[in-house]
Amino acid sequence: MDGEPVFVTGGTGYIGRPLIGALLAREHTVHALARPGSEAKLPGGALPVAGNALDASTFAAAIPHGATFVHLIGTPHPNPSKATEFQRVDLGSIRAATAAAQQAGVRHLVYLSVAHPAPVMRAYVAAREEGESLVIASGIPATILRPWYVLGPGHRWPCLLIPFYAVLRWIPATRDSAEQLGLVTLDAMKAALVRAIEAPPASGVRIVEVPEIRRT
């Protein structure tokens, strides 16, 4: 799979930039969507595509036929007060992404979703679940990854919860939830995305949960 074209949305973000760097190091050709004027924020070596992630007509024609489409866009620093943004940005962007992917004839769609069910962030989870439904309905072979929180630079406050997770894993009634909603590192997330990109399912949809994301 090395060298295959990849189209990335969210390439200027926290996960997108390191992922693009990893893909370029593996000799993939990376086309990356960015807002007009933000192209310089993409890693060097990526081929910039200026467009609006909420409007498929602004970027669908720039997706190489047969490429893998990786959708990483989401509301920055999500919290319960951002329910309107989850509908507008998270759901709106995957709606545009699936439409563009179908139009372009992509071979594989990779969607960064979120672990669920979850007892908190219900509006966020609901938007991502609806996004998953759009991916499935597209009919494109797809991989859906479901992390809960990705630890990395500027995103480390959940480290305070690690002792709490350890206790939950010892309790039979909460063990499965603790694993499903566990924390993953940025490096593990990047590696899981690369694996997904380079090993697409022949058909249907593959779901990658937290325990598999943690595998390095």
Predicted features along the sequence, with ranges:
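Conserved beta-strand positions in the Rossmann-like core of class I SAM-dependent methyltransferases
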Residues: 7, 31, 143
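Substrate-positioning beta->alpha
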Residues: 89, 93-96, 159, 180-195
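Flexible, glycine-rich beta-alpha linker
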Residues: 143-172, 179
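Alpha-helical substrate-binding/gating segment
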Residues: 183-216
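N-terminal Rossmann NAD(P)H-binding glycine-rich loop of SDR-like oxidoreductase domains
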Residues: 3-26
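NAD(P)H-binding glycine-rich loop region in Rossmannoid oxidoreductase-like domains
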Residues: 38-96, 100-103
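Conserved Rossmann-fold NAD(P)-dependent oxidoreductase catalytic core, especially the SDR/UDP-sugar
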Residues: 75-138, 143
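Conserved sequence/active-site signature of Rossmann-fold short-chain dehydrogenase/reductase
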Residues: 54, 117, 150-152
